[in-house]
Amino acid sequence: MNYLIVISFALLLMTSVESGRDAYIADSENCTYFCGSNPYCNDLCTENGAKSGYCQWAGRYGNACWCIDLPDKVPIRIPGPCRGR
């Protein structure tokens, strides 16, 4: 019985769970995507696997795209400088 529990727990840990997060989507240089309209951001976010997105006006990084439920594999804006501009 204990072996069954241990094996079940091991299988649970080995399965990859794709989680999502809400964040500013970023390019490879840690720069946000500048925006002026919600449809632009929604398209950008959904093309990258998010549920939706919108333009966050006058936010922490200026006018930038904010994505809802963005997959872990997509880069997000992290603290530090934007290296591309």
From Swiss-Prot:
Tissue pattern of expression reads: Expressed by the venom gland.
Which CDD domains does this entry report, sorted A to Z?
neurotoxins_LC_scorpion
Check the record and name the InterPro entries matching this protein.
LCN-type_CS_alpha_beta_dom, Scorpion_toxin-like, Scorpion_toxin-like_sf, Scorpion_toxinL, Scorpion_toxinL/defensin
What Gene Ontology cellular-component terms does the record carry?
A: extracellular region
Q: Which UniProt keywords apply?
A: Disulfide bond, Neurotoxin, Secreted, Signal, Toxin
Disulphide bridges, residue numbers: C31-C82, C35-C55, C41-C65, C45-C67
Q: Extract the signal peptide range.
A: 1-19
| Annotated localization | Secreted
One Gene Ontology term of the biological-process aspect is: defense response
Check the record and name the Pfam families matching this protein: Toxin_3
Q: Name one GO molecular function term.
A: sodium channel inhibitor activity
| LCN-type CS-alpha/beta domain segment(s) | 21-83
Presence of the UniProt keyword Signal in the record:
yes
Report whether S-adenosyl-L-methionine shows up as a keyword of the record: no
Where is it predominantly found?
Answer: secreted
Q: Which chain positions lie within coiled-coil regions? A: none
Per the entry, what this protein does is: This protein markedly relaxes the rat carbachol-precontracted anococcygeus muscle. This relaxation is inhibited by the inhibitor of nitric oxide (NO) synthase, N-nitro-L-arginine methyl ester (L-NAME), suggesting that the response induced by this protein is NO-mediated.
Tell what the record comments on domains: Has the structural arrangement of an alpha-helix connected to antiparallel beta-sheets by disulfide bonds (CS-alpha/beta).
In which family does this protein belong, per the annotation? Answer: Belongs to the long (4 C-C) scorpion toxin superfamily. Sodium channel inhibitor family. Alpha subfamily.
Name-wise, this protein is Makatoxin-2
